[in-house]
């Protein structure tokens, strides 16, 4: 497959200034990701206290940790359909309500079954959040700033994880029965903040075009663009991608007809995709698979146990070392957000994955040495440094790029459902790792598990090298061409020419 080298593509946005309104919308949408990150991170420490309070075993802990992701599978597949029917904005609002209910139940948590129900409901919210936040951010962004804005949800996930770790450390000093319940229940507050913020967010202009609501889409496009000329160009590109028959437009507010070939989205996406769509789907599924198959969830969720295996024994020191993981993750994702639109997705991704291979191998070696020879000062230090290095390399590339890349490569008509498939694979792998890690460490040792992760990271590097072209600076409407497609039909070029020659009321 021929790879793009990251140069400016025709139609890319040359304007270096980020639109403040689009930035604000992306920030509000990303609050939902903070809640998800918090629910993920807080469980790493909360499980220590839950186990003591509710007298549960390792298997029940694995199920409690992993059920969030199994239920997220349901949420992500549902969100794909929901976001196409009621819109991106109201799907975000729905996910906030789901998180609110789940957080209240977990905070109440009088016993294990109620805790599981709350965790399951929160998991459905996770599926909604992971699918909708990057898609919404991508659809309101210009090409030149899409990497930055679309990486904000991943940054907010990391901030949420960090807040979860800090919550573990602070509330862990309270009584056993109260501490972990406050850790879990406090996640309800960001849901309320999002519920207020959603009232000030506009709908995605691309979704509005798909609904034939061009007048509304046009007004929002002006708000999220720096100039009317930029808004006009982006609006015309969306009309082309959405296959709107512009010859039937008398006035923008007068209604339009979308061209419909009778093909369902799922048939075009999965059952009988064109070659370009097939490559896009493989790329999206592959990057989501490898994001969690390389072991990041094991470190995020079980870092206190990993550090304990390495020789850290004090509960306070375990939780502090875990806070260090959260700080490292957040810091390097912040760096990544500024590099994505400058360096490009591909270079960062390959560098990130290569670094992960070395960090995982180093961690596996150090943990194996501790397993065989007992506490060794150098092995303890190496294991902690390797853990932080793995998190750093993951966070500067594979972590944020997974969501940026998979949310931008699908054609508009397939984006919501395509993104939901990627999230579903992501959650399956996340659940697989989180629900099997403790069992695997008993079977092949903790060091052995990280040797496996290192091998998977090698396979990931080769997959990314051959299957993922550069997308930096390319408009969303041009992605299908990047993967070798010419658009929905052979007359796409004619449709583009036709669109550019017709004045859309209000822009000219």
UniProtKB/Swiss-Prot annotation:
GO terms for molecular function: carbohydrate:proton symporter activity. InterPro entries: MFS_dom, MFS_sugar_transport-like, MFS_trans_sf, PLT1-6, STP/PLT_plant, Sugar/inositol_transpt, Sugar_transporter_CS. Keywords: Membrane, Sugar transport, Symport, Transmembrane, Transmembrane helix, Transport. It is found in: Membrane. It is a multi-pass membrane protein. PROSITE patterns: MFS, SUGAR_TRANSPORT_1, SUGAR_TRANSPORT_2. The chain crosses the membrane at residues 21-41, 60-80, 90-110, 120-140, 147-167, 178-198, 280-300, 318-338, 348-368, 384-404, 418-438, 448-468. It holds the Pfam family Sugar_tr. GO terms for cellular component: membrane. Gene3D superfamilies: MFS general substrate transporter like domains (1.20.1250.20). One of its GO terms (biological process) is lateral root formation. Disulfide bonds: none annotated. Its main location: membrane. Belongs to the major facilitator superfamily. Sugar transporter (TC 2.A.1.1) family. Plasma membrane sugar-proton symporter. This is Probable polyol transporter 3. It comes from Arabidopsis thaliana (Mouse-ear cress).
